[in-house]
Amino acid sequence: MSKHKGPTGAMVDPESLPYRPCVGLMVLNKAGLVWAGRRIVIPGDEMDGATQLWQMPQGGIDKGEDPAQAALRELYEETGMTSVSLLEEASDWINYDLPPHLVGLALKGKYRGQTQKWFAYRFEGDESEIAINPPPGGHTAEFDCWEWKPMADLPNLIVPFKRKVYEQVVATFRHLAA
């Protein structure tokens, strides 16, 4: 990998940066469709300039936090959902690297990408509990709309640099959509 300019204009070597530990959540309804939200783009963030803005909930793991607890916290903070039951936890962590033009800028300039632990949940509640804009608890909205999507469609709806992650997640949880 080559070096790129960070937020201060200094050169950043992506390999010198760690991966941010995160969780990702595939939430399936009773029909086997997956919840996806359309990201609100913030200038300079990892979605800036993207046209494929649909994604599943995801977020950082706080220091000392268990990934399973982080998953439920992130799900609530981003969607308001609490009526879920765990279906499966992916056995492996999945990494992605930011594209070169975002290294040193996105993810607060501190990370080269993310390493994600994925969980699949079944949504057991009423859709009226889903609240994205604004989400509950005074959290900043990340999505401007949401839909239930066929699982197989997800890799083509996400920003291209996360596509391989979504392909792996779909392969891992495909049997849950049946």
Curated annotation (Swiss-Prot):
Molecular function terms from GO: bis(5'-adenosyl)-pentaphosphatase activity; guanosine-3',5'-bis(diphosphate) 3'-diphosphatase activity
Pfam families for this protein: NUDIX
EC number: 3.6.1.-
GO biological process annotation, one example: ribose phosphate metabolic process
Nudix hydrolase domain ranges (all copies): 18-171
Enzymatic class: hydrolase
Motif (Nudix box): 59-80
Gene3D superfamilies: Nucleoside Triphosphate Pyrophosphohydrolase
UniProt keyword annotation of Hydrolase present: yes
Hydrolase listed as a keyword: yes
Cofactor requirement: a divalent metal cation
Cited InterPro entries: Nudix_hydrolase, NUDIX_hydrolase-like_dom_sf, NUDIX_hydrolase_CS, NUDIX_hydrolase_dom, RppH
Keywords, ordered alphabetically: Hydrolase
Reported function: Accelerates the degradation of transcripts by removing pyrophosphate from the 5'-end of triphosphorylated RNA, leading to a more labile monophosphorylated state that can stimulate subsequent ribonuclease cleavage.
Family the UniProt entry places it in: Belongs to the Nudix hydrolase family. RppH subfamily.
Name assigned to this protein: RNA pyrophosphohydrolase
Organism lineage string: Bacteria, Pseudomonadati, Pseudomonadota, Alphaproteobacteria, Hyphomicrobiales
Gene this chain is encoded by: rppH
